Amino acid sequence: LPGNTSVSAGGAAAGDIAQGLSAEGLCAGYGDAKVLSDLSLQVAPGEMVAVLGRNGAGKTTALMAIAGLVPTDSGTVRVGGADLTRASPGARVGAGLVSVPDDRGLFPSLSVAEHFSLVGSSVDEAAETFPALAGLAGRRVGACSGGEQQQVAVGLGMVRRPKVLMVDELSMGLAPQVAAELLAGLRALADAGETAVVVVEQFVDAVLAVADRGLVLSE
């Protein structure tokens, strides 16, 4: 079963862990297949942490367990000091724990602007971080490139002003330059000091250049 090891990176000073994310001793899996064993992760507001590891190490399962999308056998999840261990995925979102899945969770037939309307926001707000979105408001998401779709997905998470934002497989299928722009946007969100950012990323050098530290999951 995967273990975890922390590695240091660059990054800014963070706030109080109690106001961010605290996951302790999580064990999770799918049926009889146990994928995570005793996973712990603490991320303070203002901090950006990269979750790293080989395919099959449990990175996606870790984020899904924290988000309440896979059952856990043991452990606790707290956000902003509130115990969310038994909370539903929707209740966790309401408490400020927002997750961007690896499939981005978008609706191909809806426009970019319609997506932001669904969360009570606008493209203009997200375009402050990702300027390219300003020209995509009327375009159907299904007609957007992979990089544009990922900017929409991450932007939707950011405009909710969450206490914790988790992004799975940030750069999957994207050019390094596009991935770097997304990482810079997440770094800026963390630097604003109100959000703890967790990102699963395959470009290790790129993410450790902007993250405060990395958590390496091993099989």
Annotate each PLM feature.
Residues 214-219:
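H-loop (His-switch) and adjacent beta-strand-loop-beta switch element
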Residues 157-158:
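ABC ATPase C-loop
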